[in-house]
Amino acid sequence: MADIDGVTGSAGLQPGPSEETDEELTARFERDAIPLLDQLYGGALRMTRNPADAEDLLQETMVKAYAGFRSFRHGTNLKAWLYRILTNTYINSYRKKQRQPAEYPTEQITDWQLASNAEHSSTGLRSAEVEALEALPDTEIKEALQALPEEFRMAVYYADVEGFPYKEIAEIMDTPIGTVMSRLHRGRRQLRGLLADVARDRGFARGEQAHEGVSS
């Protein structure tokens, strides 16, 4: 079977039922994969930072996903499998040629839930100053996230926006779990510093409290 951007042989893939017709395959894809389009577009937009590139990336991802869908094992994590294809397609096709980030309305990015989801693991961002950051508009959080190095940005995105556990992030990013944990820790630390600066500038944080935990 052809390599679907590095996902062949990974968890979730095995020879599919040979008796499945093309019509049945299409129906299964539409039933299981299409409902995840909005979430995948959010991931594509985080990667490319440009709506036109995000749409192109999503389209290419879904074409590849459909091509390999007959071998996807029903009952395993389809979302993680699709994100793996999305990530590898971005790395292989878009990272080197992507357009410059464009200005676009904040409502196009509605999936950012870092403040409310930061507690999902023991290394989450929850702290006194982060409580105040919940008052920040999404555009400030978006800009802070985009300021992170790519490998940190994507680790934070997958963990705190999409809610993937370490193991699945490691599969998506094709990197060891220890590396994922390190990138996530460092990314969250940098993001907390960036957001604390914004909060202090906007008057949300008070004096020395805003510096606790972010000055080192």
From Swiss-Prot:
Phosphorylated, possibly on 2 residues, probably by PknB. Phosphorylation of SigH has no effect on interaction with RshA. Induction: Poorly expressed in exponential phase; induced by heat shock (20-fold, 45 degrees Celsius). Induced 10-fold by the thiol-oxidative agent diamide within 30 minutes of exposure, by 2 hours expression is again normal. Autoregulates its own expression, part of the sigH-rshA operon. Residues 140-191 are annotated as: Sigma-70 factor domain-4. Residues 1-24 are annotated as: Disordered. GO terms for biological process: cellular response to heat; DNA-templated transcription initiation; regulation of DNA-templated transcription; response to heat; response to nitrosative stress; response to oxidative stress. Disulfide bonds: none annotated. Residues 166-185 bind DNA. A motif (Polymerase core binding) lies at residues 56-59. One of its GO terms (cellular component) is peptidoglycan-based cell wall. It comes from the Bacteria. Residues 37-99 are annotated as: Sigma-70 factor domain-2. GO terms for molecular function: DNA binding; sigma factor activity. Disruption phenotype: Increased susceptibility to oxidative stress (H(2)O(2), cumene hydroperoxide and diamide, PubMed:12123450) and heat shock (45 and 52 degrees Celsius). Loss of stress-induced expression of a number of genes including clpB, dnaK, sigE and trxB, sigB and itself. No effect on infection of human derived macrophages, and murine J774.1 activated and unactivated macrophages. The sigma-70 factor domain-2 mediates sequence-specific interaction with the -10 element in promoter DNA, and plays an important role in melting the double-stranded DNA and the formation of the transcription bubble. The sigma-70 factor domain-2 mediates interaction with the RNA polymerase subunits RpoB and RpoC. The sigma-70 factor domain-4 contains a helix-turn-helix (H-T-H) motif that mediates interaction with the -35 element in promoter DNA. The domain also mediates interaction with the RNA polymerase subunit RpoA. Interactions between sigma-70 factor domain-4 and anti-sigma factors prevents interaction of sigma factors with the RNA polymerase catalytic core. Sigma factors are initiation factors that promote the attachment of RNA polymerase to specific initiation sites and are then released. Extracytoplasmic function (ECF) sigma factors are held in an inactive form by a cognate anti-sigma factor (RshA) until released. This sigma factor is involved in heat shock and oxidative stress responses; it positively regulates the expression of itself, sigE, sigB and a number of transcriptional regulators as well as other effectors of heat and oxidative stress, leading to direct and indirect control of up to 25% of the bacterial genome. Was identified as a high-confidence drug target. Interacts transiently with the RNA polymerase catalytic core formed by RpoA, RpoB, RpoC and RpoZ (2 alpha, 1 beta, 1 beta' and 1 omega subunit) to form the RNA polymerase holoenzyme that can initiate transcription. Interacts (affinity=15 nM) 1:1 (via sigma-70 factor domain-4) with RshA under reducing conditions; the complex is disrupted as temperatures rise. Phosphorylation of RshA decreases its interaction with SigH, leading to increased SigH-mediated transcription. This is ECF RNA polymerase sigma factor SigH. It comes from Mycobacterium tuberculosis (strain ATCC 25618 / H37Rv). The gene is sigH.
